[in-house]
């Protein structure tokens, strides 16, 4: 039960991290360290800690909610406003005027 509660708290941290701008990534990484220290099984603790840190890092690098596809059109709108070019999601990055080649 304690492990499930800790994993749930980690998911809440990841959700907050995806909001961006409110807090820096390092604060979420410290939260991951604190929460995973409460998992009693060492192997599970290490796996969950590693996965959560990678997830927090990837989500915090996200631009305009890009996740391979621009589902909410924020990338396109920001590029049209800034450079008057179409915006395309390249993984988690938004690039203006550069089409995806894959």
Swiss-Prot record:
Entries under Pfam families matching the protein: Scorpion_toxin_alpha-beta (PF14866)
Cysteines joined through disulfide linkages: 66-89, 75-94, 79-96
Keywords: Disulfide bond, Secreted, Signal, Toxin
Gene Ontology molecular function terms on file: toxin activity
One of the record's GO cellular component terms: extracellular region
Domain BetaSPN-type CS-alpha/beta intervals: 63-102
UniProt subcellular location: Secreted
Subcellular location, principal: secreted
Tissue specificity field: Expressed by the venom gland.
Similarity comment text for this entry: Belongs to the long chain scorpion toxin family. Class 3 subfamily.
Function of the molecule: Inhibits voltage-gated potassium channels.
Protein name from the UniProt record: Scorpine-like-2
Native species: Urodacus yaschenkoi (Inland robust scorpion)
């Amino acid at each position: 039960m304690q492990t499930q509660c800790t994993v749930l708290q980690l998911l809440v941290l990841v959700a907050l991290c995806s909001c961006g701008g409110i807090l820096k990534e390092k604060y979420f990484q410290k939260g991951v360290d604190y929460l995973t220290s409460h998992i009693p099984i060492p192997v599970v603790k290490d796996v969950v800690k590693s996965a959560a840190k990678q997830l927090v890092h990837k989500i915090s690098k996200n631009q305009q909610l890009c996740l391979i596809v621009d589902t909410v059109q924020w990338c396109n709108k920001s590029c049209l406003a800034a450079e008057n070019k179409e915006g395309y999601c390249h993984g988690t990055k938004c690039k203006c005027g550069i089409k995806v080649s894959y």
